[in-house]
Structure formats: structure tokens, C-alpha cells
């Protein structure tokens, strides 16, 4: 049994919970710092990254979230969650949690009216993964320890750095659970390593 939390400060929380629910997975909605202790993995949902950062600071999550990732526990960030994880944000002096060695650009694919859906090849997940882009960021560049798992044209939209997974789009807004299953597998593998 693995325990995965969805950070519930803002964003598509219930959609992520629905996608994560599976035999052998206990999913919880995380609203308090002390809930992090029992988790094996954590999801940062989409939303608005600046607002999410304000709430992270307000409720004392900043250092505990960094410590959670530093323990080698898997973290999965989608859309605004991806921005929270990046070490660098284009046009800004610094990142937020600065977990993944990458530079992201906010709203890279346009504002809400320019949102779109497409099918993508995502390494380790599938070659027909439905991707819903809503005011999505893109990953401009990644460090040498970061693997690019998917591109839309020439733009990086999914990357992984060890136990950290970042995605520009919203896999939780489709009925395809393969992306979340991929993350669940990351969590199971990390827990096995931690226990050995």
C-alpha cells in the first residue's frame, strides 16, 4: 500500500484524487503540514502558481514541502504545480520551491481562450496520451540530470528528474489514467528503495 497526497490549497484537487484511486493506493487531500509525514508521494495540482505560493507561505508549507522532496519522496506537478517545482522561471529573479533543475515560461501557449487539446507521445506512459493545455507553461531548458519525456513540437512539456515529475498540461482532466499510474509506479519504486 502506498499513500499519495494531493496538495489542496487550490486547483483541480478532486480530479487528481479520482485519477490516483486504484487498488493498493490510499489517496488523501492534504490541507495541513502534518499530513505530509505519512505520505509516500505528493501531487501539486494546477491552479494559479502565484496564488498557490502565497498559500504555501501562509500555511507554513514551504520548508516542509522542500524537506519532503529532499527525502527522495516522489512529487508530481501539473501546470502551476510544474511552475512551483522549477528552479528558474523566465523573467523572474528566482523560482518558488526550486526542486527541479529547469527553466519554465508561464502561459507559454496563450491565455484561457487559446487553450487546446492534443495527443502526445509521453515516454514511459504511452504514444497517444491526451493532453489538455490551459494557460500552460512550457519547459524552456533542463539540467543534465533531467530527462525529457515529451515534447509538443519543439517545446518540452513533460520532464523527470529522478523522483520528481513535471508536466505542462492537465492529465487529470481526461479519463486516461496512465499518467497517474506512471506516477504511482514511481512512488512504489521509491518506497521499495527506501525500505531496502
Curated annotation (Swiss-Prot):
Q: Which CDD domains match?
A: GATase1_PB
> Which pathway does this chain act in?
Cofactor biosynthesis; pyridoxal 5'-phosphate biosynthesis
Active-site residues, record numbering mapped to chain? 79 (nucleophile), 170 (charge relay system), 172 (charge relay system)
Summarize where L-glutamine binds, as residue positions.
47-49, 106, 134-135
Q: Which GO terms describe its molecular function?
A: glutaminase activity; pyridoxal 5'-phosphate synthase (glutamine hydrolysing) activity
Question: Which InterPro entries has this protein been placed in?
Answer: Class_I_gatase-like, PdxT/SNO, PdxT/SNO_CS
This protein's superkingdom?
Bacteria
Question: Which keywords label this protein?
Answer: Glutamine amidotransferase, Hydrolase, Lyase, Pyridoxal phosphate
What is one GO biological process annotated to this record? glutamine catabolic process
What does it catalyze?
A: aldehydo-D-ribose 5-phosphate + D-glyceraldehyde 3-phosphate + L-glutamine = pyridoxal 5'-phosphate + L-glutamate + phosphate + 3 H2O + H(+); L-glutamine + H2O = L-glutamate + NH4(+)
One GO cellular-component annotation of the UniProt record comes to:
cytosol
* EC number, as in UniProt: 4.3.3.6, 3.5.1.2
Role summary: Catalyzes the hydrolysis of glutamine to glutamate and ammonia as part of the biosynthesis of pyridoxal 5'-phosphate. The resulting ammonia molecule is channeled to the active site of PdxS.
Q: Which family does it belong to?
A: Belongs to the glutaminase PdxT/SNO family.
| The protein's assembly and partners | In the presence of PdxS, forms a dodecamer of heterodimers. Only shows activity in the heterodimer.
The protein, known as: Pyridoxal 5'-phosphate synthase subunit PdxT
Gene source species = Halalkalibacterium halodurans (strain ATCC BAA-125 / DSM 18197 / FERM 7344 / JCM 9153 / C-125) (Bacillus halodurans)
What gene name does this entry carry? pdxT
Amino acid at each position: 500500500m502506498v499513500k499519495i497526497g494531493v496538495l489542496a490549497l487550490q486547483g483541480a484537487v478532486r480530479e487528481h484524487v479520482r485519477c490516483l484511486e486504484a487498488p493498493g493506493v490510499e489517496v488523501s487531500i492534504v490541507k495541513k503540514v502534518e499530513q505530509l509525514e505519512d505520505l509516500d508521494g505528493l501531487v501539486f495540482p494546477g491552479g494559479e502558481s502565484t496564488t498557490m505560493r502565497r498559500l504555501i507561505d501562509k500555511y507554513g508549507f514551504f520548508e516542509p514541502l522542500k524537506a519532503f522532496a529532499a527525502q527522495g519522496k516522489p512529487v508530481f506537478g501539473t501546470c502551476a504545480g510544474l511552475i512551483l517545482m522549477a528552479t528558474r522561471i523566465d523573467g523572474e529573479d528566482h523560482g518558488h520551491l526550486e526542486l527541479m533543475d529547469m527553466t519554465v515560461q508561464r502561459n507559454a501557449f496563450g491565455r484561457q481562450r487559446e487553450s487546446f487539446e492534443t495527443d502526445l507521445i509521453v515516454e514511459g506512459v504511452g504514444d497517444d496520451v491526451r493532453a489538455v493545455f490551459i494557460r500552460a507553461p512550457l519547459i524552456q531548458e533542463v539540467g543534465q540530470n533531467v530527462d525529457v519525456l515529451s515534447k509538443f513540437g519543439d517545446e518540452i512539456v513533460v520532464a523527470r528528474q529522478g523522483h520528481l515529475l513535471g508536466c505542462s498540461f492537465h492529465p487529470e482532466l481526461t479519463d486516461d489514467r496512465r499518467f497517474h499510474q506512471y506516477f504511482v509506479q514511481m512512488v512504489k519504486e521509491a518506497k521499495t528503495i527506501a525500505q531496502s
